Every structure is written in structure tokens, then in C-alpha cells.
Curated annotation (Swiss-Prot):
Binding site for a divalent metal cation 1: D216, D227, E424
Binding site for a divalent metal cation 2: D227, H296, E329, E424
Region (Disordered): 1-97
Source organism (scientific name): Pyricularia oryzae (strain 70-15 / ATCC MYA-4617 / FGSC 8958) (Rice blast fungus)
Family: Belongs to the peptidase M24A family. Methionine aminopeptidase eukaryotic type 2 subfamily.
Cofactor requirements of the protein: Co(2+); Zn(2+); Mn(2+); Fe(2+)
Top-level division of the source organism's lineage: Eukaryota
Basic and acidic residues composition bias: residue spans: 8-21
One annotated GO molecular function: metal ion binding
Note on how the cofactor is bound: Binds 2 divalent metal cations per subunit. Has a high-affinity and a low affinity metal-binding site. The true nature of the physiological cofactor is under debate. The enzyme is active with cobalt, zinc, manganese or divalent iron ions. Most likely, methionine aminopeptidases function as mononuclear Fe(2+)-metalloproteases under physiological conditions, and the catalytically relevant metal-binding site has been assigned to the histidine-containing high-affinity site.
Main location: cytoplasm
Record-given protein name: Methionine aminopeptidase 2
Matching Gene3D superfamilies: Creatinase/methionine aminopeptidase superfamily (3.90.230.10), Winged helix-like DNA-binding domain superfamily/Winged helix DNA-binding domain (1.10.10.10)
Length: 443
């Protein structure tokens, strides 16, 4: 999920102290995603037996067998409905791409002290690998099924239903979505819209052949958020745009590591992306980094942590540190390379430093209670409130925004007529190695 470069006023805001128990602060009931038995009740009925023989016996009408979900080579159905915990017993989830540190940090791979520190992170790694495998399987469905003519609502529901099934939490019971589920609303931003767009109720938008679609998916398990995005384009004229951004993201991942300086990572990303150009309808465009969008750290139950990773050259000398978790994301554009807020808001999140304000509107009090119990500080959208049976909540929600309790995230757009692309991975700066937790065979 994209992080904007903060304004000077936002820079002055004090960062609230974080709770020692994020799960409790977010209303979790003490259960964890790995406590779920993940039982699956999709057993198929047996075919009806042959009718009894005998003279004059009436011929029984054959029962039409239920259509079975197709299974992939890994035992998963299509669409994916078998929880990841059933496919990987004993929490033996696949590792991400492990990359050894370079330079002065080469020693970390074999250092006994660092290996011991790494072993203390088993719960964190289990949760992240669980979420990452759910992410890979959900986006595998998207790669296969997202086609021109599909509505954005169907795409969003297809991805989100898959994620919830894969982590074994539907999110319909109070507090269930805080244990595991969507890390943030699925971003489906088209063409000059770069980020923070997901359909609200009644949305009629349909994906067209010449569209460039950014698919930004967040999966969380016990508040550990996997944030990873890719771009879909059906017309090959956009190939270089997608290649530029994918290459730039991989450059950022390569340069990232313990003691790496954020400004230098941004410079390397910019150099890579600006080495590309794309020809559209006979006109050549340089691929520009969207300079006011950043990568970012990820904290537990908080998608945007305290550090930002620029995608252009910066004087920021801040270093990455051991134990941090980063979303390395880059955005490229054929337009201005700068985005602004425009359009109907769909994304919201309760602020971690939300003030204690006396709310006068009953509707605001009611919807805040729903947010606290079902999302905590995880981002959500209007569809998620609709799904929980909430209605007539918009006035109350807007009141929470105006009181600084909830942050609204409008769509971020470049110049109309331009095209934008995005690629993103989540990386863990473990004591011994850098793990690209969301890496898959697709990107």
C-alpha cells in the first residue's frame, strides 16, 4: 500500500508510543491465526448407488453430482479455498528468497550470535511466511482469472475471498479479521490512478483491454502484514513501462540491507527506472519515478511505519537497521511523475495516535466501535463495513475523519491520459540474511 511523502506539517506530528501488545491494542481476543483448526467442510457427496433391480421396479432418477473444485498440483482448489495451514502442517510454510548481506555484514550469515538471534524470531517468521504463501496463492488466482470485461468489484471480491479462505478467517465474526485476513483493501488502480483505489458499493467500472491495472494486495497473520503489488497489462505496448518498474523494485531490494542509507537506495531506484522509455501510439515517453510516493517500514498492525524509502535521489542519510521490515515499492509513470488526491475515498485507517475526542454523533460512536473491534489500526474500506452489515455509516465515518481519529486515503492520480505501474515486495532484515518474504515465481 503506497506511502505518500509527508508534508512539512505532517513531519511535525509526534509519533505516538506503540503498545507492547499490538494484538491487544487492536482488539484481538487472544486467539491467533495458527490456533485455527482450519477445518474444511467442502466434502463432496457420494454418487447415488444403482437402483435396486427386480421386475417392475421403478427406475431411480440419477442424482447429478456436485461440481468439484479443480485442484492444482499443490493440492489447492481453484478458486483457492483450502487453508494454507492444511497444506503445510506443523507451520512448515515456505521461506521467501533469502539473500546474504554484502560488505561489512557478510559475517552475519554464519555468526553464531546472529543465528541465535534469528532463532528467537520463529513466531514472527511463521506468521510472515504463512501470510506470504496466502498472498502468492491469491495472486496466482488473479494472474489466471483477471481478464478484460471483468468488473473491479468481481476482481476485488475474488482476491479477498481467496485471502480469507487461505488464512482460515472469514472476518464475519466480531474480531475475526484482526486475527488474520486482509492487511488492507485490495488496490485496483487503473491507468493514471497510481494507488489507493478500490471499488465502493455500486461501482460499475470494468477492466478494458488497453488498461494498466495495479493490483496491491495486503495479507496479515496476527498483525504481521505482507504488502506486495504487481501490474497487469494486456496490450504489449506497455511492456517497457512494466519492465522499468519491476527492474527498479528489484534494484531497491538489491540495495536494501542493514546499514544501507535510504537516500542512496532512492538514487539507485531512480537511475534504473529512468533508463527505460516506452512508445505508445507512436510517441516515446520517458519512464519517470513518481517522486512523492515511497516505500516504507511496516509495523505490527500498522501498514506505514516510521521510515520511508524514497524512489528518487535524496539527501536522507537514515540507515536501515536489523530487525526492520520494509515494503520496497516503486511507481513509474508516463506523466508528470507526481500524484495528487482526486476522487471518491474508499480507503480508511484508524490512526495509531488517534486523539481521545468526545464524539457527539451517535453514528460516529457506533462506527468507531465497529472499527475498533474488527480492524483496529488495519486499513479498511467501505465494502468491508457493508460486509459486516453496517449501513448509514458515512456521516459518522466522515465525522471520525474530521476529528482526526480516522485517516482517509483518497485515490492518488497523475496527469489524466498518462499510465502508471507499480511493483512491490516485503522484505525482512533478519540478523543473518535479508528475506524477500513475498517473492514468488511470478515476480
Amino acid at each position: 500500500m503506497a506511502a505518500q511523502v509527508p508534508t512539512e506539517e505532517l513531519k511535525k506530528l509526534k509519533v505516538a508510543a506503540k503498545s507492547d501488545d499490538p494484538a491487544a491494542a487492536n482488539g484481538a481476543n487472544g486467539n491467533t491465526a495458527n490456533d485455527s483448526d482450519g477445518s474444511d467442510d467442502d466434502d463432496e457427496p457420494e454418487d447415488a448407488g444403482a437402483a435396486a433391480g427386480g421386475e417392475g421396479a421403478k427406475k431411480k432418477k440419477k442424482r447429478k453430482p456436485r461440481k468439484k473444485k479443480k485442484k492444482n498440483a499443490n493440492g489447492q482448489t481453484d478458486p483457492p479455498r483450502i487453508p494454507i495451514s492444511q497444506l503445510f502442517p506443523d507451520n512448515s510454510y515456505p521461506k521467501g528468497q533469502e539473500v546474504e548481506y554484502l560488505g561489512e555484514n557478510t559475517y552475519r550469515t554464519t555468526n553464531e550470535e546472529k543465528r541465535h538471534l534469528d532463532s528467537l524470531n520463529s513466531d514472527l517468521l511463521t506468521d510472515y511466511r504463512h501470510g506470504a504463501e496466502a498472498h502468492r496463492q491469491a495472486r496466482r488466482w488473479a494472474h489466471k482469472h483477471v481478464k478484460p470485461g471483468m468488473s473491479l468489484t468481481d476482481i476485488a471480491n475474488g482476491i479477498e475471498d481467496s485471502v480469507r479462505a487461505l488464512v482460515g478467517h472469514s472476518g464475519l465474526e466480531e474480531g475475526d479479521a484482526i486475527i488474520a485476513g486482509m492487511g488492507f483493501p485490495t488496490g485496483l488502480s487503473i491507468n493514471h490512478c497510481a494507488a489507493h483505489y478500490t471499488p465502493n458499493a455500486g461501482n460499475k467500472m470494468v477492466l478494458e483491454h488497453d488498461d494498466v491495472l495495479k493490483v496491491d494486495i495486503g495479507v496479515h497473520v496476527n498483525g504481521r502484514i505482507v504488502d506486495s503489488a504487481f501490474t497487469v497489462a494486456f496490450n504489449p505496448r506497455y511492456d517497457n513501462l512494466l519492465a522499468a518498474v519491476k527492474d527498479a523494485t528489484n534494484t531497491g531490494i538489491r540495495e536494501a540491507g542493514i546499514d544501507a542509507r535510504l537516500g542512496e537506495i532512492g538514487e539507485a531506484i531512480q537511475e534504473t527506472m529512468e533508463s527505460y522509455e516506452v512508445e505508445i501510439d507512436g510517441e516515446t515517453y520517458p519512464v519517470k519515478p513518481i517522486r512523492n510516493l515511497n516505500g516504507h517500514t511496516i509495523d505490527r498492525y500498522t501498514i506505514h511505519g516510521g521510515k520511508s524509502v524514497p524512489i528518487v535521489k535524496s539527501a536522507d542519510q537514515t540507515k536501515m537497521e536489523e530487525g526492520e521490515i520494509y515494503a520496497i515499492e516503486t511507481f513509474g509513470s508516463t506523466g508528470l511523475g507526481y500524484v495528487r488526491d482526486e476522487g471518491e475515498v474508499s480507503h480508511y485507517a484508524k490512526r495509531a495516535d488517534a486523539p481521545n475526542v468526545a464524539l457527539r454523533l451517535t453514528s460516529a460512536q457506533k462506527i468507531l466501535n465497529v472499527i475498533n473491534k474488527n480492524f483496529g489500526t488495519l486499513p479498511f474500506c467501505r465494502r468491508y463495513l457493508d460486509r459486516l452489515g453496517q449501513d448509514k455509516y458515512l456521516l459518522g465515518l466522515n465525522n471520525l475523519v474530521s476529528n482526526g481519529i480516522v485517516e482517509a486515503y483518497p485515490p492518488l492520480v497523475d496527469k489524466k491520459g498518462s499510465y502508471t505501474a507499480q511493483y512491490e515486495h516485503t522484505i525482512l532484515l533478519r540478523p543473518t540474511v535479508k528475506e524477500v518474504i513475498s517473492r514468488g515465481d511470478d515476480y
